[in-house]
């Protein structure tokens, strides 16, 4: 059930409001205001308020309308919420020429204040979705979204990256709010955050994000580039230009930004004045703001939000409705709640890791080269004790080399990389032991020698037991001798042809058990284990005839 009522809005004008009553609860919809939909918890995990999100985006009036999502993101305490409230004034008073309101009226809407501490946390959206007619007659839903500032004293880099990336993924117009200039670190942070967002999205040949607007606040060089969009376009063209004389790192940052966004633009906005910056009781009254700022603000907001400027949200080329945006919101937050994505790292941490990994690689390479000189491919067999002595000596030298390299991060940070180096060197040593053993002629002849001994022993036992009348034992020994002879021939064929290498490894394992242990029980146990592990190889080498397998299955049934 719907009722119309004429109300005074927050900006002094009258507007027709339609209040909806559900069939269950005859209560009017609450007054519009900011609603936090993404909550950053104390343990730096993220929670989506699905109830609030559904209530706003799935209302009957907007859920099937194509959506335009406008977001403002950037460093904390740079006036993002202050700007969002002027956007609200425009959206509520679009038809009025003097939409900025009365000069004595305080600025309300999204929570904001002066000072050095953060105000907004997580992501907030305005609870009222604005229905706007575009020039082609299509009615779209406009969603305004305010975000937590990056790099405040209570947020990790992952917090900042997640909030920025998520707002960029959800929005169709992302305003990157910057102070005074576009510096190289601003571009590098943008590269990091957008890449963090792109990782969470499905791969596509299209650019993953839509419109990016660099909003440079407190611009102090209008004599170089004038205030507004034209000056901003010339300024941004110079800042994002890729030239051959640039360092590769600088080129990659600019190429990455161009590859992520369909449209990139810039607006240069003057400083709002000293009263705004220094007055602790400033409440947003226009009379305290410089005229130059207000003049350009009146250009900026319509430039962003006029019907012809609105970009409908698209994902993979498909236009998204409010209903669809809810599903994408849920899907994206699940990715950031999990551990699938790598955690972004600070420049110090990333540099320290690279520094330590480079030291590990250098030390390991030194060990490798010296071990190759001692027992490499063309070197003769080395006694195992001598090889172990050399290994321990070179390992100590490699560890000393690692410790001698100047590394970032400190001793505690480097300790796990030292453990990694020692572990990798031990693994290399095992490979060198195997390689060295393969050069030992006695080691190479171990398997055939063992099999010959088994054949000889079973031959003698068969002869003796046959002579004294123990025919059963003699027959058993003859059978073992025959199987061993077949095994020897099979092993020789494998060595010659290179086929059935896994079966050859089984034969070597059994021979090694007989050679090293000298225990029949141990040998039989290894034979059983090897046979169980490589059963498929036995069937491949000695296939059972079809008729025989059928008879066996019938006997089992009997």
From Swiss-Prot:
Ranges for the region named Autoinhibitory domain are 521-558
The record ties this protein, via Gene3D superfamilies, to: AHSP, P-loop containing nucleotide triphosphate hydrolases
Q: Which InterPro entries match?
A: G_GB1_RHD3_dom, Guanylate-bd_C_sf, Guanylate-bd_N, P-loop_NTPase
The free-text tissue note of the record is: Expressed predominantly in the adult and fetal central nervous system. Measurable expression in all tissues examined, although expression in adult brain is at least 50-fold higher than in other tissues. Detected predominantly in pyramidal neurons in the cerebral cortex and the hippocampus of the brain. Expressed in upper and lower motor neurons (at protein level).
The record's family statement is: Belongs to the TRAFAC class dynamin-like GTPase superfamily. GB1/RHD3 GTPase family. GB1 subfamily.
This chain belongs to which protein, by name? Answer: Atlastin-1
Q: What SUPFAM superfamilies has UniProt attached to this entry?
A: Interferon-induced guanylate-binding protein 1 (GBP1), C-terminal domain (SSF48340), P-loop containing nucleoside triphosphate hydrolases (SSF52540)
Question: Any idea where this protein resides?
Answer: Endoplasmic reticulum membrane; Golgi apparatus membrane; Cell projection, Axon
Provide the record's note on post-translational modification: Phosphorylated. Phosphorylation, by different kinases, of the N-terminal hypervariable region (HVR) regulates the ATL1-mediated membrane tethering step.
Q: Which organism does this sequence originate in?
A: Homo sapiens
Q: Name one GO cellular component term.
A: Golgi cis cisterna membrane
Chain positions covered by the region annotation N-terminal hypervariable region (HVR): 1-34
Reported function = Atlastin-1 (ATL1) is a membrane-anchored GTPase that mediates the GTP-dependent fusion of endoplasmic reticulum (ER) membranes, maintaining the continuous ER network. It facilitates the formation of three-way junctions where ER tubules intersect. Two atlastin-1 on neighboring ER tubules bind GTP and form loose homodimers through the GB1/RHD3-type G domains and 3HB regions. Upon GTP hydrolysis, the 3HB regions tighten, pulling the membranes together to drive their fusion. After fusion, the homodimer disassembles upon release of inorganic phosphate (Pi).
Instruction: Provide the effect of residue 22 to E.
Output: No effect on GTPase-dependent fusogenic activity. No effect on the membrane tethering step
Per UniProt, GTP binds at 77-82, 217-218, 276
Effect of mutating residue 258 to R = In SPG3; increased GTPase-dependent fusogenic activity
Biological process per Gene Ontology, one example term = endoplasmic reticulum organization
Q: Which residues form a coiled coil?
A: 412-439
Q: Which GO terms describe its molecular function?
A: GTP binding; GTPase activity; GTPase-dependent fusogenic activity; identical protein binding
Task: Name the reported effect of residue 239 to C.
Answer: In SPG3; decreased GTPase-dependent fusogenic activity; changed endoplasmic reticulum tubular network organization; endoplasmic reticulum and Golgi morphology are affected
List, for all copies, the residue spans of the domain called GB1/RHD3-type G. 64-309
Q: Which residues lie on this side of the membrane: Cytoplasmic?
A: 1-449, 493-558
Q: What's the gene?
A: ATL1
